């Protein structure tokens, strides 16, 4: 019986033999499509190839694409674990043609692979075609010998695929497997098609038309193929299973869950194990691709999936975090096919453990609240939206987690009420991304890239170069020229200006032509083009002119120093804190650097000092910074660090810094820092000058942020700090070396003086001011006193002294603090069961225009706006006692 890993390899090997390039799966976070939350099909990374906006050095491709469907239009989350074929994570096997072959090849490819390589009996297969696609039907008859009754013509959009409202589209043919009459269900297109007898295993899309905004449709100049076959589904079929969760890969994860929770994988908790197995895959792959749990966007979807799995682990009786303990089982199954899992294992485990530990603190309380709410409702009635929102807002229960919990009880949630409560509190709504269209502005850059090709970057070797102005874009449109005062985006054939990427800001500088001069204020990258944001400061700039390009040297040098220091900082943090440390973001600007990294706690002062010392040690060593070009695989083999979610081509730049015996990195195993990086760097570490860490703070859950200065910025900062130190020493009339002891002495002296002042205030207050004699009200002694200038913090001590004077009774103290009143009341312990200081102080405060007040039955305090009516306040307290 072939494993899922075998099936994946068989698929890719088949198409490799048939002239296809095996292309790595793209990340789950789409690189160039902001409208799509997660990669959810194999064609996503090839979208621009199909539209003609991108050309690659191959026209046939095959992939095993990792996909997530857990939000927006494609949301399988609610059904995961309860059905045989719903998943949040799945692998889509596909073959693609970009203007190369079409139906007459795509259909034979599919038939041969299924019936020969996968050895599926031909009589078990049937197909659907779009009702007007006679060509596909005839090819099926010719290639497969299928009779008419096993070529079902479908008139609905189920067999007509469209990329969006406009763009490439075309009919598709779907291949089905017949499990036989022992399983209920009818063929596709019939009334019983939702049964499980006939299962779709492969969809072949024939992109042959283009849909226009006016609704018309015209043939595409280049016809293309896009196919998709779910690995889990074909795997179940080839392993003789009717349930995807019974395949070898899913079964191994289910058994790992059962082992970790000491439960039966097929017992009453079977559904819980299925949910955990599925969600382990989606959460692990999302983290490996750079998504971290948060309260918005992709991070929130990840958190929803994590917490749903964690609730099911809780239902299995797990008392401690479970998910992170299952990661090794996943890596064993899928790490070879997806090396990013292995590389990110430590981060995945730490993130899962941290999130589950935090959520577990509120999970049980939230579930108790849910049970309490249900206990007050009639049998079968839905949970009010306000209650569901409270679970979300207070206990971190995503709505679908609450729905999942209620599903087991046959209940639902008032979703409209939940949404109304969400809107009322103005909580952040999850982003709802759908579609796959491009913006109008983006189309300009696609067109320019198509016309002129990518910009050549020269800035690794020079800060000045000659180039040609290929295009000028102002106010979102191309223009032939721009004059003084106009802002413009300039496209050149080549440039020494670095475009913002990888955390490094874009260069600034100047562009000069024979007719004008422009100040370059920023450079960004899009579709391979370097977009030079500029303002014309002299004459005019014309399309087609030659130009001299000069980068601001001082600014570039400062940026280089900060970027190189970031690499040293990254390695020093990994060595100090552990291999789980991974870059989560950075900023390399001329005036500072910022480095975000995965770590769950604040660094101690000692850890920060050690990291800073290690970085500066390598700076002082003045070792050479070397850059080599190699394949990503070769770079990783040498131990190079790659950034999560970063797109790498066939060749990468690998930057090495410093020497450390036994590091295991580099060709000699003695390189200190080795990273894949496209940024600019110093030539020797000594060029950084100095690195000063300013501090460590939380950036987001599980992510810390360090900010630092280098070079002249660091020196200026230290000089300023030294001046402050000198100024303080002069003010205290002490040498700088004596400052710590001097400040400690001053703090102690101040503390003693504060205590003395407080004591004097108490003595003055008790010895002066308006004081009444203790009187008896309702059989209880009552003593009231009005004092001047006693702050609220000193009043509890005075109340204790007043209670001591009366022995048994109640006391009230009113202090005039500059027109406003501070009040305190006290009741001796023997009377607190019948009289409360809180009641007394509230009544007195209300007489002075105050509201509230609180404390204990034996001592309470309050404040009020008007201290002039102290007598009225005393009478109000007396009235309470006499009442």
Swiss-Prot record:
It is an enzyme of class 6 (ligase). It comes from the Bacteria. It comes from Cereibacter sphaeroides (strain ATCC 17029 / ATH 2.4.9). Zn(2+) binds at residues 563, 567, 677, 681. CDD domains: AlaRS_core. Its cofactor is Zn(2+). This is Alanine--tRNA ligase. InterPro entries: aa-tRNA-synth_II/BPL/LPL, Ala-tRNA-lgiase_IIc, Ala-tRNA-ligase_IIc_anticod-bd, Ala-tRNA-synth_IIc_core, Ala-tRNA-synth_IIc_N, Ala-tRNA_ligase, Ala_tRNA_ligase_euk/bac, DHHA1_dom.
């Amino acid at each position: 019986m072939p494993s899922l890993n075998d099936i994946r390899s068989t698929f890719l090997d088949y198409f490799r033999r048939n002239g296809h390039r095996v292309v790595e799966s793209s990340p789950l976070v789409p690189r160039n499509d902001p409208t799509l939350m997660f990669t959810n099909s194999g064609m996503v990374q090839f979208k621009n190839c199909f539209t003609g906006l991108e050309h690659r050095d191959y026209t046939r491709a095959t992939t095993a694409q990792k996909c997530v469907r857990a939000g927006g239009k494609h949301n399988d989350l609610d059904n995961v674990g309860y059905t045989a074929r719903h998943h949040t994570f799945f692998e889509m096997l596909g073959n693609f043609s970009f203007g190369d072959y079409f139906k007459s090849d795509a259909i034979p490819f599919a038939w041969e692979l299924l019936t020969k390589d996968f050895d599926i009996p031909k009589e078990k297969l049937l197909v659907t075609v779009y009702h007007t696609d006679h060509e596909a039907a005839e090819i099926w008859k010719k290639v497969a010998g299928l009779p008419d009754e096993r070529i079902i013509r479908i008139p609905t959009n189920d067999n007509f695929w469209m990329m969006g409202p406009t763009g490439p589209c075309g009919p598709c043919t779907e291949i089905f497997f017949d499990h036989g009459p022992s399983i209920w269900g009818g063929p596709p297109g019939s009334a019983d098609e939702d049964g499980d007898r006939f299962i779709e295993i492969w969809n072949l899309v024939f992109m042959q038309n283009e849909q226009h905004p006016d609704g018309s449709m015209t043939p595409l100049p280049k016809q293309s193929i896009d196919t998709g076959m779910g690995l889990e589904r074909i795997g179940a079929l080839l392993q003789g299973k009717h349930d995807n969760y019974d395949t070898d890969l899913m079964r191994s994860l289910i058994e790992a869950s059962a082992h970790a929770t000491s439960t039966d994988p097929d017992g009453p908790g079977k559904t819980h194990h299925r949910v955990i197995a599925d969600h382990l895959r989606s959460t692990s792959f999302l983290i490996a691709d750079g998504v971290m749990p948060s309260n918005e966007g992709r991070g929130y979807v990840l958190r929803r999936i994590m917490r749903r799995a964690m609730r099911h682990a809780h239902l299995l009786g797990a008392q401690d975090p479970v998910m992170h303990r299952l990661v090794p089982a996943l890596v064993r199954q899928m790490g070879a096919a997806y090396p990013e899992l292995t590389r990110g294992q430590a981060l995945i485990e730490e993130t899962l453990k941290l999130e589950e530990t935090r959520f577990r603190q509120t999970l049980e309380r939230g579930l108790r609240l849910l049970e309490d709410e249900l206990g007050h409702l009639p049998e079968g009635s839905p949970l009010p939206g306000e209650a569901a929102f409270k679970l979300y807002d207070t206990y971190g229960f995503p709505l679908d987690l609450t729905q999942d919990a209620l599903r087991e009880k046959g209940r639902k949630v008032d979703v409209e009420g939940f949404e109304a409560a969400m809107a009322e509190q103005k909580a952040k709504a999850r982003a709802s991304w759908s579609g796959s269209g491009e913006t109008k502005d983006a189309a300009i850059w696609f067109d320019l890239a198509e016309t002129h090709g990518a910009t050549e970057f020269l800035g690794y070797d020079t800060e000045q170069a000659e180039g040609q102005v290929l295009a000028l874009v102002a106010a979102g449109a191309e223009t032939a020229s721009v004059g003084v005062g106009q802002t413009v985006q300039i496209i050149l054939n080549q440039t020494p200006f670095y475009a913002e990427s990888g955390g490094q800001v874009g260069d600034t500088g100047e562009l000069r032509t024979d007719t004008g001069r422009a100040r370059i204020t920023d450079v960004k990258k899009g579709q391979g083009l370097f977009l030079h944001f500029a303002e014309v400061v002299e004459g005019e700039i014309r399309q087609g002119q030659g130009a001299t390009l000069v980068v601001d040297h001082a600014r570039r040098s400062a940026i280089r120093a900060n970027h190189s220091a970031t690499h040293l900082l990254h390695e020093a943090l990994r060595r100090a804190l552990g291999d789980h440390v991974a870059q989560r973001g950075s900023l390399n600007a001329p005036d500072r650097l910022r480095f975000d990294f995965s770590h769950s706690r604040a660094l101690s002062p000692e850890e920060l000092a050690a990291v800073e010392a290690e970085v500066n040690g390598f700076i002082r060593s003045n070792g050479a910074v070397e850059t080599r070009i190699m394949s990503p695989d070769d770079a990783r083999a040498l131990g190079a660090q790659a950034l999560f979610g970063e797109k790498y081509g066939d060749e990468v730049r690998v930057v090495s810094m410093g020497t450390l015996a036994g590091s295991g990195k580099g060709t000699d195993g003695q390189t200190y820092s080795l990273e894949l990086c496209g940024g600019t760097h110093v030539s020797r570490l000594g060029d950084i000058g100095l690195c000063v860490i300013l501090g460590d703070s939380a950036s987001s859950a599980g992510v810390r942020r360090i900010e630092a200065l280098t070079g002249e910025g660091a020196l200026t900062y230290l000089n300023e700090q030294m001046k402050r130190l000198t100024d303080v020493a002069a003010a205290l009339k002490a040498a700088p070396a004596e400052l710590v002891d001097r400040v400690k002495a001053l703090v102690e002296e101040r503390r003693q003086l504060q205590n003395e002042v407080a004591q004097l205030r108490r003595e003055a207050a008790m010895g002066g001011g308006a004081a009444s004699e203790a009187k008896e009200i309702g059989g209880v002694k009552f003593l009231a006193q009005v004092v001047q200038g006693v702050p609220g913090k000193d009043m509890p001590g005075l109340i204790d002294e007043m209670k001591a004077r009366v022995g048994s009774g109640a006391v009230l103290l009113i202090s005039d603090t500059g027109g406003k009143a501070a009040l305190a009341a006290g009741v001796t312990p023997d009377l607190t069961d019948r009289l409360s200081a809180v009641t007394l102080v509230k009544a007195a405060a209300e007489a002075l225009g105050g509201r509230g007040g609180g404390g204990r039955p034996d001592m309470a305090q309050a404040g009020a706006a008007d201290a002039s009516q102290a007598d009225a306040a005393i009478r109000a307290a007396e009235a309470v006692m006499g009442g």
